[in-house]
Regions:
Chain A
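HotDog/MaoC-like acyl-thioester-processing domains
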Residues: 1-4, 94-97, 101, 105-155
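Short, solvent-exposed helix-to-loop capping segments enriched in aromatics
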Residues: 7-17, 69-78
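A generic structural signal for short beta-strands and their flanking turns/coil linkers
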Residues: 21-23, 33-35, 80-86, 98, ...
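Catalytic strand-loop segment that frames the active site of acyl-thioester-processing enzymes
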Residues: 24-54
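Active-site helix/loop of acyl-thioester processing domains in fatty-acid/polyketide metabolism
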Residues: 54-77
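Hydrophobic beta-strand-centered segment that forms part of the acyl-chain substrate-binding groove
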Residues: 70-101, 106
Length: 155, 131
């Protein structure tokens, strides 16, 4: 059961940051610990103009983000999380002019680290475009607080 | 030399620029608000950084192995070393090995200080024309 306070902000967490908004990310839904997101097909997100296939970098961005969403769902609260590392296998090219979908699940949560698996697909999870394995650091702002990255010195 | 990144819509979306100095290619992602993933710190989205690293690798492979098709990524692995500040990002790629079908590439991205990279990428690309 998702905490209603988290449930309420999940759509914003999916799409309200400047980057996710610019890419058109949308929350599709949450089922148990599994989160599903969508990015509608757009010509400016293409990686190969000859084929019209969406960019690998977009697939990576979506997998990174849906993975973070799965971490919040597993924690059942919002916290600052930061991707530690992310590995993506590109199994096939996404179908041109089709929306890209992704699902992620956090399968292990420790005090500091969350371990996530995620898949990108255009029709069904049984025929994935890409698969990812990622680790996220939890409460990663280290108490530095808002505006920490605007300070002059290297942190 | 034709600039590969200028032809790729996603590279234009990210605002990537290529700089050549002798044989050394540097890709620059000038800061834009739309690259931000965490508005509080504020920090670049991991997806902005990862995509920029991957496209730097694509451009580097395309430069060394010019052919009709763009190199296709097989897999990529990104390590995030520091949070990306709201500043320009620079990246350089190195081809560790290029065989008949596959090239292995490593890329490093930094902001003000080259000695303190914000992220690294290691990737394999298919380079064979018929693969």
């Amino acid at each position: 059961m998702i905490d209603p306070r988290l449930q309420e902000i999940l759509p914003q967490l999916a799409s309200a940051a400047a980057h996710t908004h610019a890419l058109g990310f949308q929350l599709e839904g949450v089922e148990g610990r599994r989160v599903r997101m969508r990015v509608p097909y757009r010509e400016d997100l293409v990686g190969d103009p000859e084929t019209g296939v969406l960019a690998g970098g977009l697939v990576t961005a979506l997998l990174d983000h849906v993975g973070g969403m799965a971490v919040w769902v597993a924690m059942n609260r919002f916290a600052t999380v930061a991707t530690l590392d992310l590995r993506v296998d590109y199994m096939r090219a996404a179908e041109p002019r089709k929306d890209l979908l992704a699902e992620a699940e956090c399968f292990r949560l420790t005090r500091s680290v969350a371990f996530v698996r995620a898949w990108a697909f255009d029709e069904t999870t049984a025929d994935p475009v890409a698969a990812a394995q990622a680790a996220y650091m939890l409460d990663s702002d280290g108490g530095r607080g808002p505006g920490a990255n605007l300070k002059g010195e290297e942190s | 030399m034709t600039d590969v990144l200028a032809r790729i819509p996603y590279a234009r979306f990210l605002g990537l620029r290529t700089q050549m100095e002798a044989d050394e290619m540097t890709v620059i992602m000038p800061f834009q608000d739309k690259l931000i993933g965490n508005p509080l710190l504020p920090a670049l989205h991991g997806g902005s950084t990862a995509a920029m690293l991957e496209l730097t690798a694509v451009a580097r492979v395309a430069l060394s192995f010019p052919r009709l098709r763009l190199p296709k990524p097989i897999n990529v692995s990104v390590a995030y070393l520091r949070s990306g500040r709201p500043r320009d990002v620079h990246a350089q790629a190195r081809i560790g090995k290029a065989g008949r079908r596959v090239a292995h590439v490593t890329v490093e991205a930094w902001q003000e200080d080259r000695a303190n990279p914000i992220a690294t990428l290691s990737a394999h690309f298919l380079i064979a024309e018929d693969a």
